[in-house]
From Swiss-Prot:
This is Peroxisomal (S)-2-hydroxyacid oxidase GLO4. Belongs to the FMN-dependent alpha-hydroxy acid dehydrogenase family. PANTHER family: PEROXISOMAL (S)-2-HYDROXYACID OXIDASE GLO4, S -2-HYDROXY-ACID OXIDASE-RELATED. The keyword Kinase does not apply. A motif (Microbody targeting signal) lies at residues 361-363. It is found in: Peroxisome. It comes from Arabidopsis thaliana (Mouse-ear cress). Its main location: other. The active site is at H252 (proton acceptor).
Amino acid sequence: MDQIVNVDEFQELAKQALPKMYYDFYNGGAEDQHTLNENVQAFRRIMFRPRVLVDVSNIDMSTSMLGYPISAPIMIAPTAMHKLAHPKGEIATAKAAAACNTIMIVSFMSTCTIEEVASSCNAVRFLQIYVYKRRDVTAQIVKRAEKAGFKAIVLTVDVPRLGRREADIKNKMISPQLKNFEGLVSTEVRPNEGSGVEAFASSAFDASLSWKDIEWLRSITKLPILVKGLLTREDALKAVEAGVDGIVVSNHGARQLDYSPATITVLEEVVHAVKGRIPVLLDGGVRRGTDVFKALALGAQAVLIGRPIVYGLAAKGEDGVKKVIDMLKNEFEITMALSGCPTIDDVTRNHVRTENERIKSML
């Protein structure tokens, strides 16, 4: 594993290790996959404005999220069904997160139970949720998470319906029975045609979910609530108005609406609307420590890593996940040093130049 030097190499190992159905499920995006590619490429169009002759002999990457200290502004995004990638599933991912002193957001669609993840290691973790048509199911899971010591709820708000993921349709992707829901609802679908995941989502997810439901969620939990899946100023303002505790700028890993903007291109729009009132996080397309720096320079408090974590898990289990996080942290530390930023607070908007700024400078 010492010879693996970047996320792309982990992706190639994951492709070799996984059955095609599972690799395509993790890796694929919606329809033409334009946004999937753009999430990554948009980062590459942002250039640095490094400062020199700054004392960077000691680099401090540490920060906090909702008051919980983390070793770097790199957290684990919620991704579904980790046991499809590795037999130990979310438990392996959780242990790696704990070893790296960061926060894992456990997926509502996890293959290990909330209690199994909670008892696997001592760490701060959040729970991502969907709201089902059967609200009692969502409520039970939230209450179990609270009891198990989870520290926040992350409500995904961009899935009134599942996006059209053509690889899953072609592969007849199965939806396995998830242990969290045993005795509550059947999640298993083995389709003769189409995607089983889409079939399950259509039957279970509540398409009537609206801003007023933040109140309902507040009524069933005392935990902080973040909303994940915002891409516009308008929705950011509504989120603040609804009293949420944080926002994740996300296009669901480009798995929902193709031709949605790359998240890094709309981050500033959301940050300017929020005006520092609540934390803004970002996911989508982060593949390098340089990407982490760019997101922070444009106003994010932290980034969430999705697919790279699954690639590490599929390739090398817990050690693979840890290696992915450590690589990104190392790249980020180098970027801070070479940009003249000894601490997170030193990373500013002046340290990057966006594509729009480059074009304007040529006019």
